[in-house]
């Protein structure tokens, strides 16, 4: 016989029951915390977008704004781009009939922003839709006592999209104490 292929294991680190219990509880806690990042709820829709004073502050800034449209009237049904196919599949995931699918058509905005000073921040998306002309619609998200990098999402979908049309122009605002401290807008915003 050439020898044993397995070596006897001596669990040096896991000898005491207290060490095993600590390791097990750490794994359970880590698993629970990994599932705590819940998706954002719907943004608050404002009846009227109030005009606010402009006071730009370098401590607040937009990093990137991603826009996407999911409208079958203006998008070709077949594409060879895998990323576009995946994005459409992600947006329509879970829709079981044409009514649910129609509620997912619209414009989607993902906004990456950051602030270096801890404060109460309101992120507002103001937008104009094709069927409303120059009337400005607005949605907000409030972040109490926050600092650091953030990712926020806004959707203009469902009845709002089907009745008023797609978004023609938009602007994103960071608001602190009733003042606009950061601003980013689309080319068509005036």
What is each model feature region?
Residues 1-36:
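Sec-dependent bacterial lipoprotein signal peptides
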Residues 34-52:
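Bacterial Sec signal peptide processing site at the extreme N-terminus
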Residues 57-93:
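Post-signal-peptide N-terminal segment of Sec-exported extracytoplasmic proteins
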Residues 78-115, 151-155:
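Contiguous beta-strand segments within globular domains
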Residues 120-128:
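Beta-strand-rich binding/interaction modules
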Residues 142-150:
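Short proline/glycine- and polar residue-rich coil/turn motifs
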Residues 161-167:
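Short glycine/proline/serine/threonine-rich loop/turn segments at secondary-structure transition edges
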Residues 180-190:
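Short beta-strand elements
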